[in-house]
């Protein structure tokens, strides 16, 4: 469960 955006998400 990731309540934060991943480090590889597009801008």
From Swiss-Prot:
Q: Give the function comment from the record.
A: This peptide evokes slight hypotension (-2 mmHg), when injected alone into rats. It has a bradykinin-potentiating effect (75%), when 60 nmol of BPP-11f are coinjected with 0.5 ug of bradykinin into rats. It inhibits angiotensin converting enzyme (ACE) activity with a K(i)app of 82.10 uM.
Intracellular or extracellular location(s): Secreted
GO cellular component terms, alphabetically, are: extracellular region
Tissue note: Expressed by the venom gland.
UniProt keyword annotations, A-Z = Hypotensive agent, Metalloenzyme inhibitor, Metalloprotease inhibitor, Protease inhibitor, Pyrrolidone carboxylic acid, Secreted, Toxin
Source superkingdom = Eukaryota
Using the record's annotations, give every residue carrying the modification Pyrrolidone carboxylic acid.
1
A GO term (biological process) for this protein?
A: regulation of blood pressure
**Could you state a single Gene Ontology molecular function term?**
toxin activity
Q: What is this protein called?
A: Bradykinin-potentiating peptide 11f
Q: Which family does it belong to?
A: Belongs to the bradykinin-potentiating peptide family.
Plastid found in the keyword field: no
């Amino acid at each position: 469960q990731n309540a934060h955006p991943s480090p590889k998400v597009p801008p």
